[in-house]
């Protein structure tokens, strides 16, 4: 008749979460000056690391040093040529303009200069075909391994040559041609540095009437990296601005909106400090971390501050308002952080470095946001309440 099952115990389930929450917010309430001061000192000490964050992307570094992709690339580049590619496009306005000996001679001189760069292993252009034919039709005399001075002779060589591969380097109107450079560097910044030197050389030495531009896969990669990272940085600032605006509309108070931004900006600082300290690049993968961390962190801040402010308006004392708020919302924000960070931390097991960094930094951002909401935010609220009471 009687139910003999044991009564539920208060320590079951996720009761341990409540103990963690209490320990954090009670520390923030009891020692607000210490918590606030030590947090500011800690962030200040980490600020110099922000200048060590390097904006860089290198596809080779996305894999471990012993990964077949990297080892095979190193082997190929050691015996043949660099796998990177830059194409310098040359164009004239007139038909057959690239049969001009001056233009062809400049293309060859540019190749000679480029091949002296440590980053360039090899170069090929239409001028190589003409130079080779001029040398071959003159008994392979080394003195004739040059571009002929007579445009008519160049036309005759091209008339005789029937290889289709020539038109891989020049169009059939002989108005557009390109010099293909095989480069052995892969970081976007180093590729950009090579392109800058090429631009300087051509700008100083190109003959009048010869238009030029740099293209190729490596140029695309360098530009893509720059545009992507800049776009992500701009989107981060846009997200912060939008969050601040929504906070302002929600709380109808400039001070409250600014206050709620502190726990949301702090994870970003911590993420970039960690990146600077451990040499993690800001690349196309890690650029997304800050925006995601902010988007998730703002949810916890709204839970905490909404509960606190609504109780303050009801006439409850600040200490009791914080205690009741965390008693109600503390378990939820901690459990949410545990679940989300567990999903992201699994990515650390990946062999692909961007995925590993993405999962690690996102988890760090989530836990940082939680600590700031449970510890730093209560200390600020207590200091503000004390200041208001004193006034």
Q: Language-model segments: which ranges?
A:
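Small-residue-enriched core segments of transmembrane alpha-helices in multipass membrane transport
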Residues: 257-278, 293, 357-374
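Extracytoplasmic
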Residues: 32-284, 382-391
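Hydrophobic transmembrane alpha-helical segments of multi-pass transport and channel proteins
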Residues: 236, 240, 265, 269, ...
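Hydrophobic transmembrane alpha-helices
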Residues: 244-247, 264-265, 281-305, 342-345, ...
